[in-house]
């Protein structure tokens, strides 16, 4: 099982890990070789865990940040976090549809309700370059989004959003409806709706 630390676990970018049985670990070859600090007198990668798969200087600030993120998740209800995020997502979808019920100016990617959704809403703005919209949201309204293909060009081909990609909004439990309203107002002004 391989995982990234910066998505659902809420840790810093550049963190992650994997769980593997001892038997499988002995069969696997490391992808990267180099010093580990534990067996410095040889150029060979150690055979023991975790050093076998951890070349170079460990990302201690990242590991500490991931640890703190896991402690946060341990002390907060995952169900409550999920409910808050989905509530915000539903609200944002409603506001987008109220802003442009024709879908001519804003194309919502995926279902327009919470069925099979997580706390992410991707849109396209067919009449205005999406990079420009994302730039204006950030620089004029302080609304951070992600624009483009999101490291997943094949997913965008499947969705019919390739090669332009989308503008992606994602919500966390710290976000508020007021912040979402601010993003909607920014879109309204930028798209001249």
What are these regions (language model features)?
Residues 1-193:
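Pyridoxal 5′-phosphate
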């Amino acid at each position: 099982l391989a995982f990234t630390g910066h998505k659902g676990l809420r840790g810093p970018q550049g963190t992650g890990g994997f769980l593997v049985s001892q038997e499988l670990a002995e069969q696997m070859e490391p992808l990267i070789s180099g010093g580990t600090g534990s067996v410095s007198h040889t150029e060979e990668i150690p055979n023991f865990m975790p050093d076998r798969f951890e070349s170079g200087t460990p990302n201690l600030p990242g590991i500490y940040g991931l640890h703190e993120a896991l402690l946060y998740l341990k002390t907060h209800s995952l169900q409550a976090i999920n409910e808050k995020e989905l509530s915000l997502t539903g609200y944002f979808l409603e506001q987008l549809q109220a802003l442009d019920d024709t879908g001519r100016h804003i194309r919502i990617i995926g279902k327009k309700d919470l069925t099979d959704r997580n706390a992410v809403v991707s849109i396209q703005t067919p009449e205005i370059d999406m990079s420009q919209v994302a730039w204006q949201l950030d620089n004029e309204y302080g609304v951070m989004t992600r624009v483009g293909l999101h490291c997943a060009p094949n997913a965008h081909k499947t969705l019919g959003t390739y090669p332009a990609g989308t503008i992606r909004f994602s919500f966390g439990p710290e976000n508020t409806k007021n912040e979402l309203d601010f993003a909607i107002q920014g879109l309204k002004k930028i798209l001249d709706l």
